[in-house]
Regions:
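Mid/C-terminal beta-alpha module of Rossmann-like enzyme folds, strongest
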Residues: 354, 358-415
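NAD(P)-dependent short-chain dehydrogenase/reductase
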Residues: 251-258, 286-343, 348-353, 357, ...
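N-terminal Rossmann/SDR dinucleotide-binding element
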Residues: 80-198, 202-205, 212
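Conserved Rossmann-fold NAD(P)-dependent oxidoreductase catalytic core, especially the SDR/UDP-sugar
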Residues: 193-194, 198-202, 209-217, 221-272, ...
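Phosphopantetheine-dependent thiolation modules in NRPS/PKS and related acyl-activating systems
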Residues: 1-97
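Amphipathic terminal alpha-helices
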Residues: 106, 127-134, 426-460
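A hydrophobic C-terminal alpha-helical subdomain
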Residues: 334-338, 397-438
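Active-site Tyr-X1-5-Lys
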Residues: 265-299
Length: 460
């Protein structure tokens, strides 16, 4: 049945309505229409809407929560600073360190079609301890599981000699970790649970923006299902997480996320990726505390192109860091705030290698920070591009970006809108010690590496 069309009541509602008309081309919009279900907005539309409302300090996540004109206008009018999820944060989770040894002979790997997951696959293929690798993949876009697997191998490993190793070690499973029994039949699930010795859970929804329940299923429910499998199979778990579980803190706070902390009174600005990855860690830490599973958590930093051959993720435009650099290259301006940011550049092949090596080393710690500690300033990165960047202030920078009218620039606008908040600083000291003990270290980033990064950005 037709929903009644509600007309705008205020100037602000009218303004949002007109922007939506121009974005969607839909003439007849009700102020109660849901942006996603009724108007069919996609993530680029959302970025565009947030950019066009940036004078109201509206961020992308706000649009996902207040997802019709009435709610969004109200959010702007009340300057409602309440963050939807902050009350969910539990303060009673502790990280317990219990050393144990992984048996790597039979590994279940999720997320193999992702950039990190595919590089973890490579490390498992060349590791003689690993006899079988079961890859859990779901059918997608009319592509079979085999199609998706082959596409990844061809994209990332076309000039690697691994066909024989794949034929010998890899078993593809048509499943879905968001579902009960990992989307397998009960019989398949039961048979699998008798074989697997280690689970590497690299699968996740890593997009930056979207609806909470979609992320909850992919990042939290999935992790609960993986934990269930580990309990059923007595397999040990390696869980791939992110440094950004540290969320944001005030620029003047002296907060530090270490490998022995998960709560640092961070705020998440309604960032659903961060929130759900945080919640997933809490689920695992709870089960470790209750002695139900043996698990380690690997928090990854800024995953960047391989150091060996410069390859980067297929869906480059979805990478927030590259999008930000592209925006700066488009306007050829920067600010002191941007210049002074220090960035970790962690080549994906080293991330994958270090994860597997740390698993084999049976270290004391439960949580590791897989992030290159040789930080590099944005100023240094921009200088390496051989482009002249003029200096300006934040306000002018936002205006310049908005003139470009490209929704991908929303990442940088979001950063500039709340200069008082920074991503919570973290340290890698404990992980560094463990890496040093097995004779591994992160390299300093070279000019050539940055040159390759520049060439990649120019392809976006």
């Amino acid at each position: 049945e037709e929903k009644e069309k509600v007309k705008p009541n205020t100037d602000l509602e009218k303004e949002i309505l007109n922007i939506l008309k121009s974005i969607t081309g839909i003439k007849d919009i009700s102020t109660t229409d849901d942006f996603f279900e009724d108007l069919g907005l996609d993530s680029l539309n959302v970025m565009e809407l947030s950019t066009r409302l940036s004078k109201y300090k509206i961020e992308i996540q706000d649009i996902n929560y207040y997802s019709n004109i009435q709610k969004l206008a109200k959010k702007i009018e009340t300057h409602n600073k309440v963050n939807f999820f902050e009350d969910k944060i539990r303060n009673d989770i502790s990280i317990i360190n219990r050393p144990f040894k992984y048996n790597m002979s039979s590994v279940l790997l999720t997320g193999v079609t992702g950039f990190l997951g595919s590089n973890i696959l490579y490390e498992l293929l060349i590791n003689p301890e690993v006899k079988k690798i079961y890859c859990l993949i779901r059918k997608k876009y009319n592509m079979t599981v085999e199609d998706r697997f082959n596409k990844i191998v061809n994209n990332y490993f076309s000039n690697y000699d691994i066909k024989e190793l794949i034929d010998k070690k890899v078993v593809l499973l048509d499943g879905n970790f968001e579902e009960i029994y990992l989307g397998l039949t009960l019989e398949e699930y039961y048979n699998l649970s008798k074989k697997i010795t280690t689970v590497i859970h690299s699968g996740a929804n890593v997009r930056h923006y979207g609806k909470y329940d979609v992320f909850y299923k992919a990042n939290v429910q999935a992790t609960k299902n993986i934990i269930r499998f580990c309990i059923d199979s007595k397999a040990k778990l390696a869980h791939i997480s992110t440094i950004s579980v540290g969320g944001y803190c005030n620029v003047n706070d002296k907060k530090l996320l270490t490998e022995n902390k998960i709560n640092v009174d961070q705020t998440f600005k309604n960032h659903v990726y961060m929130i759900t990855k945080y919640e997933a860690e809490c689920e695992i830490l709870k089960e470790i505390e209750n002695k139900n599973i043996d698990a380690k958590i690997f928090r990854l930093g800024n995953i960047m192109p391989r150091i060996s051959d410069g390859r980067f993720q297929i869906n480059m435009h979805q990478n927030g860091f590259l999008s930000r650099l592209k925006t700066l290259l488009d306007i050829k301006y920067t600010t002191n705030e941007i210049n002074n940011l220090h960035i970790d550049i962690s080549p994906v092949d080293l991330c994958a290698k270090f994860i597997i090596k740390l698993m084999e080393a049976s270290c004391e710690n439960t949580v590791f920070h897989i992030s290159n500690p040789n930080f590099i300033s944005m100023k240094e990165i921009l200088n390496s591009f051989n482009v002249e960047f003029k200096l300006t202030n934040v306000e002018n920078c936002i205006n310049l970006i908005n003139k470009l009218n490209n929704p991908l620039n929303a990442h940088l606008v979001n950063d500039l809108l709340s200069p008082e908040l920074i991503e919570t600083p973290y340290s890698c000291d404990i992980t560094m010690k463990d890496l040093n003990s097995i004779k591994l270290e992160w390299p300093k980033i070279t000019k050539d590496y940055l040159k390759n990064l520049y060439n990649l950005i120019m392809q976006i």
